[in-house]
Amino acid sequence: MIYTNSDGGARGNPGPGAIGIIIRKDGKILVKYSLMIGSYVTNNIAEYEALIKALQLASEHTKEVTCILDSELVVKQLLGEYKVRNPRLLELFLKVQKEQEKFDVVRYKCVSRENKFQQIADELLNEELEKHGFKKKVFR
């Protein structure tokens, strides 16, 4: 079984956005991936973009995948528990459905940000943002 942990974030929401992804099997990380995705995106758009890329990367390794995210909105939309009302999110939702066709089985799971693998994906996206000059704001 292959597991993906994906995370997307935007500084400013909306603002500059990036994604971070890990692909793992048998407790070992096979792939670490991060990418800057735009200068004006929302957190929800970034979460969907991260999942789409995670599915693309996982399809190179398996036909059965469990996708783990910390976005309750995205997971519940994919499970049909929430409607997709935002036109941009609907476009991304449909892209996810298209990517799912590459698999025999796709499962979705929402976890806390404190999940150790989710934290790695989060670190990857934050490193990507910082590499492009978008520093975290520190509140004092």
What are these regions (language model features)?
Residues 133-140:
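Extended, charge-rich low-complexity interaction segments
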